Design a protein with these regions (language model features):
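Short, Lys/Arg-enriched N-terminal segments with co-localized hydrophobic residues
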Residues: 2-15
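A residue-level detector for conformationally permissive "hinge/kink" positions
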Residues: 4, 40, 44, 61, ...
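N-terminal active-site beta-alpha-beta segment that forms phosphate/nucleotide-binding
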Residues: 14-130, 134-137
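Conserved phosphate- and dinucleotide-binding cores of soluble alpha/beta proteins
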Residues: 19, 87-93, 97-260
Length: 260
């Protein structure tokens, strides 16, 4: 089911395209179908990819489609949103490792075409400039997949006083470190900094697809997509994207159900 939520914001009408899903499995299926359609439309497309728990189900669905002969990743190129600073790419909690484990190693993608920030580059300014050049070289993603943090962050663009344009070196907030602690043995093992594509880089994507599930994301959904556009709710900037789709389950939409 597709519902359109239209709201006024300052000068004009902003329309957020929302696909309502029953649960996480349904979110994953619907998101995978959108990505598969993009690959069929343009076999050499550039996919912007995300990590964390939200897209795992989507990746499983894509792998199943590949194994069933429905998808060919051989020409696909990818740009990942972010990477922890200080974790080598073979560390089991690095996002490079995550992508290999959850997608790349299970499909016929050329991993030379898979781009992820280098978390081991000590030259923060140099790494940010390098990754900006990668993103700009592609002209942005054809389709950017995103998750949404409980505090409204996209990538590692945390709540702040102004939107950041390009790739940046960020200090993670305590709430994000707390949320990521479950992936590490103890809290002090969680990286405190990361490289992340900036808001401007994300907005360069031709299409943006955000997946969201669970009641823990309900407030962020309400704040980001039914509230004012402000850097304190980083995901709210997506209201201004010309081709943005939110795929969310009933729990994630629970605080805005009466608005749909």
């Amino acid at each position: 089911m597709i519902k359109l939520s239209s709201k006024k914001y300052r000068k004009g009408i902003i329309t957020v395209r929302i696909i309502c899903a029953k649960d996480y499995a349904d979110v994953s299926r619907k998101a995978a179908n959108i990505i598969a359609a993009q690959i069929h439309l343009k076999p050499n497309c550039v996919l912007g990819l995300a990590t964390g728990s939200s897209p795992v189900g989507t990746y499983k669905e894509l792998i199943a489609k590949y194994e069933n002969g429905e998808l060919d990743f051989s020409q696909v190129k990818t740009i990942n949103l972010d990477e922890y600073v200080g974790l080598p790419k073979d560390h089991d909690q690095s996002y490079a490792y995550f992508m290999r484990s959850n997608l790349f190693d299970h499909v016929n993608i050329d991993q030379a075409n898979c781009n992820i920030p280098n978390g081991m580059n000590p030259d923060a300014a140099g790494e940010c400039a390098r990754y900006d050049a990668v993103v700009d070289g592609f002209g942005g993603a054809d389709l950017q997949l995103l998750g949404l943090g409980p505090n409204g962050h996209i990538g590692f663009n945390e709540p702040c006083d102004e939107f950041v344009n390009g790739t940046n070196h960020v200090k993670l907030t305590d709430s994000t470190i707390d949320a990521n602690q479950r992936f590490f043995e103890k809290r002090e093992d969680v990286p405190t900094h990361a490289y992340t594509m900036g808001i401007g880089s994300i907005m360069k994507a031709k299409r943006v697809l955000l997946v969201c599930n669970g009641e823990g994301k309900a407030q962020a959904v309400k704040d980001c997509f039914f509230g004012p556009i402000k850097p304190q709710s980083p995901g709210s900037i997506l209201q201004l994207h010309p081709d943005f789709t939110l795929v969310a389950d009933e729990e994630a939409l629970s605080l805005v159900a009466d608005l749909l």
